[in-house]
A protein has these predicted regions:
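Active-site-adjacent helix-turn-beta-strand microarchitecture at beta-sheet edges
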Residues: 1-53, 94
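Short linear motifs in exposed loops
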Residues: 16, 250-252
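His/Asp/Glu-enriched, well-ordered alpha-helical/loop segment
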Residues: 44-55, 62-81, 85-86, 91-98, ...
Length: 252
């Protein structure tokens, strides 16, 4: 066991994400906290001192800011502490992730699930703070990707598609939702390979096909870098290798 997860706030859909300002569609509500701020501060200190990485569930911009403040106070970059989801980040806090060595662990597919209604929750002035992947990457951060299954599909290719298009499977919206924050295909692939390995202290064993690394990899029927993004969800896994052994083979 490398780390522990602490829940700070709720979800955006239920208006439970902890915000700096009230919800645009619920002016008396700024969300909620599941774990008390002082309890989180104590737990982070205890777990980091014991050698554990801490991942804090934060969706709203206030939750993210407070978590960053706590990590700054603890000052434990070597722990590679993470913020899980990091969906809504105030513009003033973008650079702090890299500066503090805090890893934003994000799930691209959440963006394309939430984009239909999130403008109602946040309003036009805050909407550009939603899933700011490219802003984080340009500041120096890495973004390990995931699916948050069973909340979303565990298929990593759907996550890659969401990351580089910010569209749903029907191609909506044209041009992508907040397209300036899309990842490149190379960034999206790194997100589910080498960056994820780094985020779990396994970058010397996983995340690359390279001499000395474990032979854990997949073989696809197409090159993700050479096909149109709209075709990525159609790509099939032909083989899955674990420690050099075929554990899955697609039926011909």
């Amino acid at each position: 066991v490398n780390g522990v997860k602490i829940y700070f706030d709720g979800a955006m859909g239920s208006r439970g994400a902890y915000l700096l300002e009230p919800y645009s569609d619920d002016l008396n509500n700024i969300g909620l906290t599941i774990t008390n701020e002082n309890q989180i501060r104590k737990k982070v200190k205890i777990f980091n001192d014991a050698g554990f990485q801490v991942a804090i569930h934060c969706i709203g911009d206030k939750a993210n800011r407070i978590a960053l403040n706590i990590f700054e106070e603890i000052d434990s970059k070597s722990s590679r502490n993470r913020i899980e989801h990091a969906q809504i980040i105030h513009n003033e806090d973008i650079n702090r992730f890299y500066e503090l060595g805090v890893i934003p662990s994000m799930q691209a597919i959440h963006c394309t699930s939430d984009m239909y209604w999130i403008d109602e929750r946040l309003g036009p002035k805050r909407i550009d703070q939603s899933y700011p992947w490219q802003s984080l990457l340009k500041s120096g951060s890495i973004i390990p990707g995931g699916s948050d299954a069973p909340v979303e599909s565990p298929d990593p290719l759907l996550g890659v598609y969401a990351a580089i298009t910010r569209k749903d499977l029907d191609g909506w919206p044209i041009g992508g939702w907040l397209p300036n924050e899309r990842m490149t295909i190379d960034q999206a692939i790194s997100s589910i390979t080498e960056w994820s390995a780094y985020s779990m202290f396994s970058e010397e064993f996983y995340g690359k096909i390279h001499k000395g690394y474990l032979a854990d990899f997949t073989v696809l029927n197409n090159n993700l870098s050479q096909i149109e993004p709209k075709h990525i969800p159609e790509v099939k896994v032909l083989y899955t290798f674990v420690n050099g052994v075929i554990v899955y083979q697609h039926d011909k």
